[in-house]
């Protein structure tokens, strides 16, 4: 049985909390029989009111008490799924939660599939598909900023914009269809139509320009530089723990070390890489190839140089490829006039630090933050990959429409392109495989 074909009138049940010893375990039901099934295992069976907590006990088939619980009934349509929903709040623990779950299954409830509660919320019109995806994105948010974006979309920020764009396209389609049906002289004034179309394309492009990957995956920062420049020491200083191995021997780091942390609500992913030098073994060759690969995929490069040898050039493949900060390390060893001369002739943002003694580390962090805020703005709307693909498809149909207008194609072709763009933005026109792909990512109980 696929999620898209679930018969939503039956009653489902699942443990909604992490199954482990804890303070509280929540067992959730949804469906027409949710209230009856919950009452069937509870001692107190009267005076159940929607959205009011009930203190009672759960008992088994032999009337043996299982646990003291709080029960919260939520009658349709004022619930997450717009069905009758009941949450049983028991003491945390594997045995108690599973016992209550099994009692409810024995009485006729079906064990929910991953994401089935949210799927029912979507099918019953409680959430749009974009909002349903936002629930998942909120659960898996890697940073405070991403959580805020997910919550904003859950409250309808993206759905509202998509609805607005789609409504404007429908208005354009209505103009075309009305002309085809009723205009006998077969003339159509395109100036206003073209202006509206251009405005809609710009709206879609603005959504596509949102750098959403930074919210979802964080800012990727690569530490690159020659061997023995102190990259690993600086890496450890930035993340606040001893993650990379540090020795006086050049070339100690032979593999990429990654660490993730949050600064000012943004997720940063730091990569410590092997020092760049003339390879003396196959391992070193592979390590430096990996470092160059990280350089290509990251968003910001820290080019780290030993302050005692400040004249080492930046490799050509790093020049003008992406934002780059030059970090002169080991100023505790040497901060000579030669370094000052080099700094005067460097076009990239620079900072002098001592990773060993954390000198100017706050200044380096501030520079990293400044570069990050130039990559994206915190007030943008988040769109995921599926939504981005649909927006790109809609835009392509509209661009094809523009070409058709320029080439004098009949209005029937214009109408066809408009209908295709409108369909791309229809949140209710989703096939079963897409629904399965989305909701199967949820945990059971959500």
Swiss-Prot record:
Membrane as UniProt keyword: no
EC id: 3.6.-.-
Amino acids binding (6S)-5-formyl-5,6,7,8-tetrahydrofolate: 28, 87, 126, 446
Cofactor(s) demanded: K(+)
Name used for this protein in its record: Probable tRNA modification GTPase MnmE
Keywords assigned: Chloroplast, GTP-binding, Hydrolase, Magnesium, Metal-binding, Nucleotide-binding, Plastid, Potassium, tRNA processing
Binding note for cofactor: Binds 1 potassium ion per subunit.
Localisation per UniProt entry: Plastid, Chloroplast
Protein family (similarity comment): Belongs to the TRAFAC class TrmE-Era-EngA-EngB-Septin-like GTPase superfamily. TrmE GTPase family.
Ligand binding (K(+)): 228, 247, 249, 252
Primary site of residence: plastid
Binding locations of GTP: 228-233, 247-253, 272-275
Cross-referenced Gene3D superfamilies: P-loop containing nucleotide triphosphate hydrolases, Probable tRNA modification gtpase trme, domain 1, tRNA modification GTPase MnmE domain 2
Stretches assigned to the TrmE-type G domain: 218-373
Gene Ontology cellular-component terms listed: chloroplast; cytosol
Xref: CDD domains: trmE, TrmE_N
Gene Ontology terms, MF aspect: GTP binding; GTPase activity; metal ion binding
Alphabetized InterPro entries for the sequence: G_TrmE (IPR031168), GTP-bd (IPR006073), GTP-bd_TrmE_N (IPR018948), GTPase_MnmE (IPR004520), MnmE_dom2 (IPR027368), MnmE_helical (IPR025867), P-loop_NTPase (IPR027417), Small_GTP-bd (IPR005225)
